[in-house]
Amino acid sequence: MTPFQAVCTALASTVGTGNIAGVAGAIAIGGAGAVFWMWVSALLGMCTKFSEVTLAVHYREKNAEGDYVGGPMYYIKNGLGKKWYWMASVYAILGSLTVLGTGNATQVNTITTSIDSALISYNVIDDAQISMVNLVIGIVIAALVAVVLLGGVKRIGTVTEKLVPFMAVFYIILAIGVVVLNADKVPHVFEMIFVGAFNPSAFTGGVVGSMFMTMRRGVSRGIFSNEAGIGTGSIAHACADTDEPVKQGMFGIFEVFADTIVICTLTALVILCGGEGIQYGVAAGAELTISGFVTTYGSWVTIFTAIAMCCFAFSCLLYTSPSPRDRSL
């Protein structure tokens, strides 16, 4: 695949649930100050992501079909030597187990939650029908993912090349609209973020009283979103048709910036500027982000937020679901 397709495929794995439900969860449990620590983790994560991607391209191999394959398991094996083969195997096994939860279950949950919210807001379904609707959604998702994955890594790259830029621009426009329409609240929101990072109880009524909790939530959600330090993003970059590892590593830096500094920040502003009263200390997900859009635009926007969130989550599913033809841990 081309370097741009590799970037889009890697972004597909990072621009997903973490940008929507993850940010909402961080703010609900850690307060607005969690956003500050998310930024800090992103700045450090840019360095980590650059190293991961550069190493992945440098130590990659060609498979039986002549395509490039790489990632942490390859640069551990080829970079550290035979005595560290066991570590490469451990990473591959743990990585396979991880995608079952963070890569698949959470993404499908976001898709069903967003579609359910849209259908309920238009009175298409009621609470009693949600289980059946979710079953149908699950079957449709499985079929769509299978169609793409059976085409191998090239088809994944082709789909994400078209889907990722569209969904990112679409979501950014919606989010910027919320910020513009609530411009008078922006200064106070940034005050909440910076002051709350070191004194979270100042804006949460004492519910969130530990700076450590705020820091932990912000850093963990930031890593969950941009995957810097996890290594999985480098697997897609290793497939890029390039002979310049360092140049591809720079794309890794851009990836973290776009994911966390831009999209996660906009999500936080949507929640803090346009959202309803936040119940601090109570776990929250995509519904908190949706409320930010609905409060500003009205219930009609739920159909558009559902489309955006489905695109985010579906693209992430494509990346984290291994292709039977080209990708394997």
Each predicted region: which residue ranges?
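Membrane-interface "cap" regions at the ends of multi-pass membrane proteins
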Residues: 1-20, 65, 241-243
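Helix-loop-helix module between adjacent transmembrane segments
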Residues: 11-14, 41-66, 73, 77-109, ...
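Helix-loop junctions at the membrane interface of multi-pass solute transporters
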Residues: 14, 24-30, 56-62, 148, ...
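Membrane-interface alpha-helices at helix entry/exit sites of multi-pass transporters
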Residues: 32-37, 83-90, 243-256
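Extracellular/periplasmic helix-exit of transmembrane alpha-helices
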Residues: 52-60, 64, 174-192, 203-206, ...
